């Protein structure tokens, strides 16, 4: 459909090779994906929905195409919350852009990276300041429930605010967690938390025999008392 006369209307740019390209004044050249752009002009020769990548980050500029670049004029390699935007720590989640300097305004409410300088964390669904990746920095062990514990485990309910999480023997808020795992043996008393021998006497201040269960209460607390 394109003539070989280079001076004619819409001359064939590839007169010796069959092709159907019709964009960028490059007519009649091979166009593998049929999007109108010659393979030599097309940054995505097997994807008919994308053809140009202005910032050379691997994501196409067409917002309606496959994997569209969210920041078409700024090179970036984010791939999780949006494609092709700056991702300082390289975890796949783009840096927040509250002013829209690189593209549309984008905040943590849009799933931007809450920790743009920490490759191990990116989101905090329960807003308790501990990241949801349990294997990452200060990982939240109860990502679905806000909590302030930080001694035995991070981000779980701590009723008395002493830093030790409440026991969770059925795993309602996270993994099963008992006093044996480090949970608070006294979840309603901020001054006590450990009872290694399970005798009901606090190890840190009261139990004179913290590693041996006992019921003594007179001369000393929490030690064996043979006659009761």
Residue ranges: model-predicted function:
Residues 1-228:
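Extracellular calcium-associated, cysteine-rich motifs in secreted modular proteins
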């Amino acid at each position: 459909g394109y003539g070989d006369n280079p001076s004619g209307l819409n001359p064939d740019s590839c007169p010796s090779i069959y092709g159907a390209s019709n964009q960028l004044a490059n007519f009649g050249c091979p166009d593998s994906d049929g999007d109108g752009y010659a393979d030599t002009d097309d940054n995505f020769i097997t994807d008919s929905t994308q053809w140009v990548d202005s910032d050379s980050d691997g994501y196409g500029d067409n917002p309606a195409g496959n994997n569209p670049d969210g920041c078409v004029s700024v090179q970036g390699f984010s791939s999780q919350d949006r494609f092709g935007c700056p991702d300082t720590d390289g975890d796949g989640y783009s840096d927040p852009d509250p002013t829209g300097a690189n593209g549309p305004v984008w905040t943590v409410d849009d799933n931007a990276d809450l920790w743009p300088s920490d490759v191990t964390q990116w989101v905090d669904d329960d807003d308790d300041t501990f990241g949801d990746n349990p294997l990452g920095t200060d990982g939240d062990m109860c990502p679905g429930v806000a909590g302030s514990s930080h001694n035995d485990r991070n981000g779980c309910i701590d009723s008395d605010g002493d830093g030790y999480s409440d026991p969770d023997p059925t795993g309602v808020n996270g993994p099963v967690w008992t006093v044996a795992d480090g949970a608070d043996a006294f979840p309603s008393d901020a001054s006590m938390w450990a009872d290694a021998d399970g005798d009901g006497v606090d190890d840190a201040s009261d139990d004179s025999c913290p590693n041996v269960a006992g019921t003594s209460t007179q001369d000393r607390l929490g030690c064996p008392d043979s006659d009761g």
